Regions:
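Short, structured helix-loop element that forms part of the nucleotide-activated donor/catalytic region
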Residues: 42-46, 230-259, 263
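N-terminal strand-loop element at the rim of the active site
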Residues: 6-65, 152-154, 162-165, 240
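Aromatic "clamp/platform" in nucleotide-sugar-dependent glycosyltransferases that forms part
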Residues: 265, 284
Length: 386
């Protein structure tokens, strides 16, 4: 079997988002992994049953550390000698693609997820664009996570190479048997959570899942929420993110508002999604947010901003609403409409939400698409060699 090396900056990506995908691919290829050593490192090897190589990689810009990472990745590539290497996340992309180019790995694939440079300005934006152009120059194949990411790569002229979105986008898909309102224990845990929050049948629970930082649109969310009727409640699932902290007024509202429930990080978000009446994601930028797929699989309608990724999952009037980013009045209006929606219309939207995810983003389908994608690339090598 052909050798395949998959790399990520941190093992948490392999432990959560890409979980079990390498194991599936190992049924068709000889798969090994490379990522930074951290608390989750040993879990990845155990979960996937595969060899995991230690290559420390630092998030952010650090020229000396990045050069050390490239040297260590070169050593891994010289030992593994893969026919194909695939990197996810920005720093792993830079380190892996440069090292793989130096080692002349035949097929070098990088997947771009959420792009940072479109929302940056000045010198920082120029530096980020230069890094992404370098990644593309070293790669043989470039995979945008979704059509929005593809459009940004093209409009900023990051590369002239062909860009291919796998399936309908996203890097992992979602297990719709696991993320299901009728999965064992979900209904009970959801009911218990509503009871713990003091919610009756007449209360409407909005749910946000993600890092609590300013780029997630929390300021607009809290402003919109405060204008809603007193039957509205808001559950925030996720930890405070100090890399881009929310403003003081928003943080104070999160901590003091009697109908805002900050539940912190949850290892299993199904109880929160099951307890909620609607998911809201007012982000300023995204790549292809997994939480939209998870909520949809749980038959939960969504209010999201009209940005990359979100507008590839949410179809207004079908499975949710789209609002402009940074627009609190528009967000408030959508939240009011959701609360006022007649039960039959809501039930139909819930059905649409789950059906859309099952049809386009089922995890097993995505794995099969990835396997076919890799096989096509490796077959092209064989034809060239003949």
């Amino acid at each position: 079997m052909m050798r395949l090396l998959i790399t990520t900056t941190v093992p948490e990506t392999l432990e959560t988002i890409l979980k079990n995908q390498p194991r599936y691919l190992a049924g068709h290829f000889q798969v090994e992994l490379a990522t930074s050593p951290s608390e989750s490192f040993s879990k990845v090897g155990h979960n996937e049953g595969l060899v995991v190589h230690r290559v420390p990689m630092m998030r952010g810009i650090s020229v000396l550390n990045d050069l050390v990472s490239v040297v260590r990745m070169v050593r891994v590539l010289c030992r593994v000698r893969p026919a194909l290497v695939h990197s996810y996340t920005p720093k792993a992309g830079l380190v892996t693609m440069l090292a793989a180019w130096l080692c002349r790995v035949p097929v070098r694939v990088h997947t771009f997820t959420g792009l940072i440079f479109p929302t940056e300005q000045g010198l920082r934006q120029k530096l980020l664009i230069w890094v992404d152009r370098l990644i593309c120059a070293c790669a043989t194949h470039i995979v945008p996570e979704g059509l929005g990411v593809k459009k940004d790569l093209e409009s900023f002229r990051i590369t002239r190479k062909p860009l291919r979105v796998i399936g309908y986008g996203n890097i992992a898909g979602v297990n719709t048997a696991y993320f299901s309102a009728v999965a064992p224990g979900v209904a009970q845990s959801a009911a218990e959570l509503r009871k713990r929050l003091g919610l009756g049948a007449e209360e409407f629970l909005f749910c946000f899942v993600g890092r609590l930082n300013k780029d997630k649109g929390l300021a607009e969310l809290l402003q919109a929420f405060r204008a809603l009727p007193t039957t509205a409640h808001l559950a925030l699932i996720g930890d405070l993110d100090q890399t881009a902290p929310v403003d003081a007024a928003t943080l104070a509202a999160i901590r003091s508002h009697p109908r805002v429930h900050a539940l912190g990080f949850l290892g299993d978000i199904r109880s929160a999604l099951g307890a909620a009446d609607l998911l809201v994601l007012p982000s300023y930028r995204e790549g292809f947010p997994n939480v939209l797929l998870e909520a949809g699989a749980m038959a939960l309608p969504v209010i999201a901003t009209d940005i990359n990724g979100c507008n590839e999952v949410v179809e207004p009037g079908f499975n949710g609403w789209l609002v402009p980013p940074r627009d609190s009045p528009a967000l408030e209006e959508a939240m009011r409409l959701a609360m006022q929606m007649p039960a039959p219309v809501r039930d139909q939207m819930c059905q649409h939400a789950r059906a859309r995810i099952q049809q386009r983003f089922e995890r097993q389908q995505h794995w099969e698409r990835m396997g076919a994608f890799y096989q096509g690339l490796l077959d092209s090598i064989k034809r060239i060699g003949e």
